[in-house]
């Protein structure tokens, strides 16, 4: 008999070992910085402004503030009592400027309705209305230190010199066709400056109405202007985010103040001429050293554009803006106090 050998035992091939997993770096989750806390709700007061505060002026005696707003109203406030004295008047369109007359008993206010109105501070009674006629709205207004003349800048490009005693136009100076967005009067009352939304600056002789100089001062519009006490220098703020100090004797830029990240809309000089405050659409006001051009402090409203700035008699910085409030700020920077709140929305 044939003997068959047993079938061979099949050994399955050894499966290759799985490859080792690649080393994977463990990336920790990103650290997300917490959002800054939201600003506290704004206080309100029924008699406050109902829209942006676009102008502030401090009375010569330092006791009161006058404000102009796009809600058409002019309001007079008591600083010490922290309350409204009265709504001084209402324009037919946005109010733009409100200035105390040197006599201490009246004010001059102006707005987009084209009217310049002299009002009694004691009760708001209208003493005189200066109508700009076909010149359009009054964007900015300035008064000579002796109270004899007012200079108005208009949205149709003209600059008008008013004889306040006679209640009449002394000169109507033709600009360059662009809306006039800044005006200022020299301390001696003999010269005036106008700035336009194209960045052009013009120096005028008030008595004759003649143009003394014209130059392109900024790459964008000029929205704030102030003469220094010596009358030989001028500061201007602009939509190009800069502030410039001009030497009027040479016509050259003497210094530049930089730091804002939006249009510089308002300027004011301290009584001693050592400090400059600027308000900007970037939501900040900044305090500057006039001698060095260095920034001393920054005030951040966190509530939108700042349209108006002023110094009180003791040097406190005041601002007004998009949030309808009037605020005062510590000189070294930091948080503000709402001096006068806006009306409830």
Region locations from a protein language model:
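Intrinsically disordered, low-complexity, repeat-rich polar/charged segments
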Residues: 1-32
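WD40-repeat beta-propeller superdomains and closely related acidic/aromatic-rich repeat-like regions
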Residues: 21-345
């Amino acid at each position: 008999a044939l003997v068959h050998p047993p079938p061979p035992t099949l050994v399955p091939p050894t499966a290759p070992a799985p490859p080792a997993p690649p080393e994977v770096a463990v990336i920790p989750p990103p650290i997300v910085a917490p959002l800054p806390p939201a600003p506290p709700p704004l206080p309100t007061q029924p008699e406050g402004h109902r829209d942006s505060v676009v102008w502030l002026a401090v009375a010569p005696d330092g006791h009161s503030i006058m404000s102009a707003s796009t809600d058409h109203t002019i309001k007079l406030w008591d600083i010490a009592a922290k309350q409204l004295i009265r709504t001084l008047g209402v324009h037919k369109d946005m109010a733009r400027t409100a200035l105390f007359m040197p006599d201490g008993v009246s004010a001059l206010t102006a707005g987009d309705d084209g009217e310049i109105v002299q009002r009694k501070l004691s009760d708001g009674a209208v003493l005189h209305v200066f109508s700009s006629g076909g010149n359009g709205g009054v964007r900015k207004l300035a008064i000579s230190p002796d109270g004899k003349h007012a200079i108005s800048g208009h949205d149709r490009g003209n600059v008008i010199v008013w004889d306040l005693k006679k209640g009449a136009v002394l000169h109507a100076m033709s600009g360059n066709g662009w809306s006039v967005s800044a005006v200022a009067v020299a301390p001696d009352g003999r010269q005036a400056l106008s700035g336009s939304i194209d960045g052009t600056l013009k120096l005028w002789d008030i008595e004759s109405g003649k143009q003394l100089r014209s130059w392109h001062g900024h790459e964008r519009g000029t929205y704030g202007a102030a003469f220094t006490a010596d009358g030989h220098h001028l500061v201007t703020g602009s939509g190009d985010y800069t502030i410039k100090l001009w030497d009027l004797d040479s016509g050259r830029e003497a210094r530049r103040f930089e730091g804002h990240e939006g249009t510089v809309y308002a300027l004011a000089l301290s009584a001693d001429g050592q400090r400059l405050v600027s308000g900007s659409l970037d939501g900040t006001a900044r305090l500057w050293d006039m001698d060095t051009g260095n920034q001393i402090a920054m005030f951040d409203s966190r509530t939108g554009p700042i349209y108006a700035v002023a110094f009180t008699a003791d040097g406190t910085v005041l601002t007004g803006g998009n949030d309808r409030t009037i605020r005062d700020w510590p000189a070294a920077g930091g948080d503000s106090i709402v001096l006068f709140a806006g009306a409830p929305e």
